[in-house]
C-alpha cells in the first residue's frame, strides 16, 4: 500500500500531485515560484503536491495557466515530459525511475 492509499487519496489527486511536481521540477521552479505565479501561498502548493487538497476548477485553471498547459495535461496519467535542465532530469529519474 502506497502513502497515498494509506491516506485515502484518490488516484486522480495522486496523478495531479505528481504531475504538478513533475512540471514544477522540469522548469526548475520552487514551490514558492509556482505559488507566486498562481497567486497562492507556498503551503497550498505543498498540500496539493502531497495530495492533501482537493483543488477547485478555478485553482486548477490558474495552475495550468502558470505552466502554460491545458488543464487536461494536469490530469493526464502520462508522465513523459521532455526535460531540458540536467538537474531536473536527474531528480526526476531518481524520484520516478
Regions found by a protein language model. Name each.
Residues 1-10, 75-97:
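Short, charged recognition helix plus adjacent turn
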Amino acid at each position: 500500500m502506497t502513502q497515498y492509499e494509506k491516506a485515502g487519496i484518490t488516484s486522480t489527486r495522486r496523478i495531479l500531485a505528481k504531475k504538478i511536481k513533475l512540471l514544477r521540477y522540469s522548469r526548475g521552479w520552487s514551490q514558492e515560484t509556482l505559488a507566486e505565479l498562481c497567486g497562492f501561498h507556498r503551503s497550498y502548493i505543498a498540500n496539493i503536491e502531497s495530495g492533501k487538497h482537493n483543488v477547485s476548477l478555478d485553482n486548477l485553471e490558474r495552475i495550468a495557466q502558470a505552466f502554460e498547459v491545458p488543464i487536461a495535461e494536469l490530469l493526464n496519467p502520462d508522465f513523459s515530459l521532455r526535460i531540458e535542465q540536467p538537474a531536473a532530469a536527474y531528480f526526476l529519474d531518481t524520484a520516478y525511475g
